[in-house]
Amino acid sequence: MKVVELPGFQRGFAKLPKHLQEKTWYQLHTFLEHVGSPVKPKSLRLKKLPFGNFEVSINMDLRILFQLHGDALILVLLGDHEDVRRYLRR
């Protein structure tokens, strides 16, 4: 699967401390291992959101907002719950 990072994700990722960057890649790797599987690990806290968006939790405060288009995983945003809500309101 091809992974595409949009600027909103890149900005959020650059602001994170090293340990959260590592946790972010770990969660993405875990998600990619289970794409197409009917069972996803509960630790991902995967949610389907409006407009073809999905959300995966990094920790209790941090979320990845993404979209799936064919064989591409589009990483849209990395931020807290309020950042995700603001993005979805647009």
Please state what every model-predicted region is.
Residues V4, G8, A14, V39, ...:
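Basic nucleic-acid-binding interfaces
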Residues T30-V56:
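A short, surface-exposed loop/turn module that caps and links secondary-structure elements
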Residues K2-V4, R11-K15, Q21, V56-R90:
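Enriched for short, Lys/Arg-rich terminal
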